[in-house]
């Protein structure tokens, strides 16, 4: 172990001075290094928390459609290009914007074989309108599935463009969409899951 040549205390360097002896000799005080804060910043915590809520909502919808025999393909940016989320943080470009806007899923109806883009959103308020959609959203034929603490509702990008919206009192439930022809009892089961997961959010 290296010792100070003056006082014998621990030092980093063999045949060197410890910090106290060095400061006395040079009549200066080494700057106090501010201890770095450990853990996530508040901004990073919020980002990660919202990401987790979104992923839970996506998983609920994925499992709901899978349980009804749908072919479900994860399509969003984090699935098509793994690791891209971190790379695009703070990047402002047309390409980055297009990648961020990719819908979460491509789903195929087992009966009709129709294919749909599906974007999943969690909203504690249970509300969604055109102002919640990115400007110039390129997937005009996509369905927006909104998972809230109480309901699972659905609206198309086209309907949002016509001024329609999802509110706490609207009746645009996922089970009412004729395009999907879903079992309402299964949807109710998944609504109960949503209540369990998002009850305290």
Named regions from a protein language model:
Residues 20-30:
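Short Cys/His-rich micro-motifs in 6-15 aa windows
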Residues 8-12, 25:
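Cys/His-rich microdomains that often coordinate metals
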Residues 49-57, 64, 91, 100-103, ...:
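Catalytic phosphate/metal-binding cores of nucleic-acid and nucleotide-processing enzymes, i.e., regions
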Residues 34-93:
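Acidic-basic catalytic patches of nuclease active cores, encompassing PD-(D/E)XK
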Residues 31-32, 112, 153-201:
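Non-catalytic C-terminal interaction segments of nucleic acid-processing enzymes
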Residues 68, 112-172:
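Catalytic cores of nucleic-acid endonucleases
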């Amino acid at each position: 172990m290296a010792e100070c040549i003056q006082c014998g205390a621990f030092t980093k360097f063999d045949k060197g001075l410890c910090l106290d002896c060095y400061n006395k000799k040079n009549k200066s005080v080494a700057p106090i290094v501010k201890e770095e804060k450990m853990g996530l910043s508040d901004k990073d915590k919020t980002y990660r928390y919202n990401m987790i809520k979104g992923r839970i909502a996506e998983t609920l919808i994925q499992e709901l459609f899978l349980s009804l025999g749908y072919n479900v393909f994860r399509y969003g940016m984090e699935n098509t290009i793994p690791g891209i989320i971190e790379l695009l943080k703070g990047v402002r470009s047309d390409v980055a914007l297009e990648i961020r806007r990719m819908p979460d899923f491509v789903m195929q109806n087992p009966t009709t074989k129709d294919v749909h883009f599906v974007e999943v959103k969690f909203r504690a308020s249970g509300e969604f309108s055109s102002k919640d959609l990115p400007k110039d959203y390129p997937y005009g034929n996509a369905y927006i599935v909104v998972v809230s603490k109480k309901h699972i509702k659905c609206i198309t990008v086209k309907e949002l463009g016509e001024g329609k919206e999802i509110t706490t009192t609207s009746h645009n439930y996922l089970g009412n969409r004729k395009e999907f022809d879903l079992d309402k009892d299964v949807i109710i089961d998944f609504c109960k899951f949503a209540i369990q997961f998002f009850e305290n959010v």
